[in-house]
């Protein structure tokens, strides 16, 4: 996701894309990429750029976005993390419970067991989770293996 040694990215993008990447929990605009980037560092909207700054003039507003990578550099390549966020957002209007039972074939009981430590109701949607709650889910389960628990570590 980020080239080795890169600490800061400065990108210009359509305003709506910047909103989705920087949206906070409980926002319907939240996306898997935005959550991943927020776990990796800080995102800051530097400034808006009006359509008049370009030739030909586009029909969209732009935003300059600064991304400072401070932690979890390889998060975007982690297959378990990618499976977790993609599977959780598989069908936007569905709850986490319904996405997990449909996408991974977990039983309703198994899906409820994964939600319980977060203290969330079973009606929770993926955009409602905090970054800490996403981290907890990622640490507890190997999501690329149909949401199963992480394998026990054997003797070294």
Located regions from the model:
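Class I S-adenosyl-L-methionine
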Residues: 1-126, 136-156
